[in-house]
Amino acid sequence: MAENLLIHTGSKEEKYRELLPQLQALVSSETNRIANLANIAAALKQTFHFFWVGFYMVEGNELVLAPFQGPIACTRIRFGRGVCGTAWKEAQTLIVPDVELFPGHIACSCLLYTSDAADDKA
């Protein structure tokens, strides 16, 4: 597969519809999980311009940082801690409108609190 994604402008749903078959083609011939996760993270960040997108892998009672795109992240998250650890503990997806208001939120990146962001909060 080509290294370029072909995503047209449109709604988030339309972009996901266009992206999914391209991701499937991208990972179908690669057997290395790390390589596939790295490309998936890059494709999601490139398509949606997310602040951070990535993966954690289970290692014992912790989530360990795996391929990601964005600023430096927490390397390990304990079971039941923060949004990710809580989602793992509850075995379900959590949609959190404002992670700062989530009980037990783990602030992994100070970039969330730049002067522009601080000005927006004031």
What are these regions (language model features)?
Residues 62-108:
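Regulatory sensory and allosteric helical modules in signal-transduction proteins
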Residues 113-122:
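Single conserved hydrophobic/aromatic residue that forms the stacking wall/gate
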Residues 1-66:
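Intrinsically disordered, low-complexity terminal regulatory regions
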Residues 46-49, 89, 116:
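Solvent-exposed polar/charged
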Residues 47, 108-112:
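Short loop/turn motifs at secondary-structure junctions and domain boundaries
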Residues 2, 97, 118-119:
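Intrinsic disorder/low-complexity signal
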